[in-house]
Swiss-Prot record:
InterPro entries documented for this protein: SAM-dependent_MTases_sf, Trm8_euk, tRNA_(Gua-N-7)_MeTrfase_Trmb
Organism: Schizosaccharomyces pombe (strain 972 / ATCC 24843)
Protein known as: tRNA (guanine-N(7)-)-methyltransferase
Classification lineage: Eukaryota, Fungi, Dikarya, Ascomycota, Taphrinomycotina
Residue ranges crossing the lipid bilayer per the database entry: none
Any GO CC annotation of this UniProt entry: tRNA methyltransferase complex
Amino acid sequence: MSATAKKSAAQLQREEEEARKKLKRLSKQGGVEGRLPMKRLFRQRAHANVLSDHELEYPRSPSEMDWSPYYPDFDVESNKKVEIVDIGCGYGGLTVALGPQFPDTLVLGMEIRMQVSDYLKEKIQALRYRADHEEPVPGGYKNISVLRMNCQKFLPNFFEKGQLSKMFFCFPDPHFKARKHKNRIITSTLASEYAYFIRPHGTLYTITDVEELHVWMAQHLDAHPLFRRFTKEEEENDICVTLMTNETEEGKKVARNGGKKFVACYERIPNPK
């Protein structure tokens, strides 16, 4: 048996944590500017329990949220607000891809898992450095950020009515057991909440590799009076559909394994008069 095999899970976790701390110290000392973080040092279980208590900080209302630490290069006085949100962004493949595509728009990835959100935070810092010193890109990744948060509880603390133009739900936890279906990210109640945040003619995007979950999400959104499902032609002509299909880590994994991806997108229609 190898030495690695003999190590306990706790020992491996401690070693990985020490390695992460070392990298962070080097980064602060200027030793690894522009170096992308190693994903293996930020591994965590695929999903988190949204009903568990997490040590999270959130404002009492959207007006009390200070976004300047997240978007330090944007003029706070201009009152620019987050418009695109990647819910459960994971390691940030889509969040990062959206940045150059919408360089004048603030994009936010929201992720409940601490290790994963820490990874994306460091990745964004490295990408910003590279954009400034090596490979310029539109927006320089200064318009993207990540926030560790439970999106099924605290979105009203961050976003106002009609603030968002796009919301993405990419490869969410399928919660296979029937008793867990109430914890799914798309429900009738949550669909109404999302309709509150998305402005008229904004878009809600979903993608999953689990057909049963795809049917569930589509049924709930189809039934909602404020959402209209995209036609296939509309999906094919939307660059964001291409990005969420090809740029997310889960999407790439599904492609490598030869799996299927199920997409459903919805326009937020105006409130009836």
